[in-house]
Swiss-Prot record:
Biological-process GO terms, alphabetical: defense response
Keywords: Disulfide bond, Ion channel impairing toxin, Neurotoxin, Secreted, Toxin, Voltage-gated sodium channel impairing toxin
GO molecular function: sodium channel inhibitor activity; toxin activity
Protein name: Toxin TdNa2
Length: 60
């Protein structure tokens, strides 16, 4: 699945100042194929279904 991964609160991880290499490492460490900084958060490609993803309920 292509999505924003979510942290334990269901929120998107912010990318530090547009760092696509940092996001790529985060995404691949979660089992995704790659990722980039879609500021202000990391967008991942090919995440496994077991990974939590952002569902627009952060801070609600």
């Amino acid at each position: 699945r292509d999505a924003y991964p979510a942290d334990w609160r269901g929120c998107k991880p912010s990318c530090p100042w547009g760092s696509s290499s940092w996001c790529n490492e985060e995404c691949t460490s979660l089992g995704g194929s790659s990722g980039y900084c879609a500021w202000p958060a990391c967008w991942c490609y090919g995440l496994p279904d077991s990974v939590r993803y952002y569902n627009n309920k952060c801070h609600k």
